[in-house]
Design a protein with these regions (language model features):
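C-terminal "post-core" interaction segments
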Residues: 1-307
Length: 307
């Protein structure tokens, strides 16, 4: 993934899903080296497609200053960028002495879990020190949710995991005392810092970055033969991970909904239609048909597998 700088997240995530579903089920290597970032929710929404776990997006917070207080007060509900969740804690800073506001996600948690897992094989993520911004956040979420091993060719990512705003946007949202820069100059600032979730909940991503689980020093063969040793290292990591499979096709059988399942290394499958539980089956590896009750042949079917 060379960039997360995309016009919108929907087409980006859909294309990732399309490509991931074409990949062999034995393992997937995702390479985000040199990815400078982009749209935060484009990165965070990808995570759900790689794991059965519920994704908790990373949280962000403002430093408490008179200007961020002004910014939050001027951009409440209905504004192009709604800062109402951050406003109370920023406003209390004079009383509490807190240096930073409370933290909240930018990406809607519901949107981080609205697609579900689409690739069921093991995954390894390759990073380097030139991963910044959304890529820092993506790598942190990958590690925080134990999706797979992070393989780094450096001992950290770029550690620039912050929400970056252009000066022009700040001028639009905050107004005075900011002024337009001379000679059409521009600049960007880190407006909100990111905090991690999971086992490292509350740890700053900015400056600390994402330390890889496994480090690989690039070799002469990597440089001359298209990363051959790096890929071999990633493949060896994948080879040690368990394989899971949950494939399903649905069709009507009279008034019933017939689901053909093919599973591997899964002990139980729960069936839901429009988020309503329908049944739970203990299963063995292989294929089988499951008929859901009469009258439930309409709606969105969701399957959840458990080990």
């Amino acid at each position: 993934i060379r960039t997360f700088s995309v016009p919108g997240d929907v087409a980006f995530v859909n294309e990732f899903v399309r490509l991931a579903e074409l990949m062999p089920p034995d393992g997937l290597i995702i390479d985000v080296r040199d990815n400078g970032g982009g749209l935060i929710w484009a990165g965070e929404r990808l995570l759900q497609t790689l794991t059965p776990k519920t994704i908790e997006p990373e949280r962000l917070q403002f430093i408490n200053t008179a200007l961020t207080d002004q910014l939050a007060k001027a951009n409440g509900a209905g504004a192009s960028i709604d800062l109402s969740k951050w406003r109370p804690s920023i406003s209390r800073a004079g009383e509490t002495g807190a240096s930073f506001s409370c933290s909240f996600p930018i990406t809607d948690p519901a949107r981080c879990n609205d697609i579900g897992q689409r690739y069921h094989g093991p995954v390894v993520l390759i990073t380097n020190a030139r991963c910044y911004s959304t890529t820092d956040i993506f790598a942190a979420g990958f590690q925080d949710h134990d999706i797979g091993e992070v393989l780094g060719i450096d001992n950290n990512t770029g550690a620039g995991g912050a929400n970056v705003w252009e000066h022009g946007l700040l001028l639009q949202l905050a107004g005075a005392p900011l002024k337009a820069l001379p000679k059409n100059a521009g600049m960007r600032v880190a407006i909100r810092r990111t905090l991690r979730v999971g086992k490292q909940a509350g740890t700053e991503l900015e400056d600390l970055g994402v330390v890889p689980d496994v480090e690989h020093k690039m070799t002469r063969r990597d440089l001359l033969e298209n990363n051959v040793d790096l890929i071999e290292k990633a493949a060896s990591i994948l080879a040690g991970q368990p394989r899971f499979r949950l494939d399903a096709t649905a069709s009507k059988a009279g008034s019933k909904l017939r689901v053909k399942l093919t599973t591997q290394n899964i002990d139980r499958v729960d069936f839901e239609i429009d988020s309503r539980p329908q049944r739970s089956d203990d299963i063995a590896d292989g294929s089988r048909n499951v008929d859901l009750p009469t009258g439930l042949a309409h709606g969105t079917l969701s399957l959840k597998g458990y080990k």
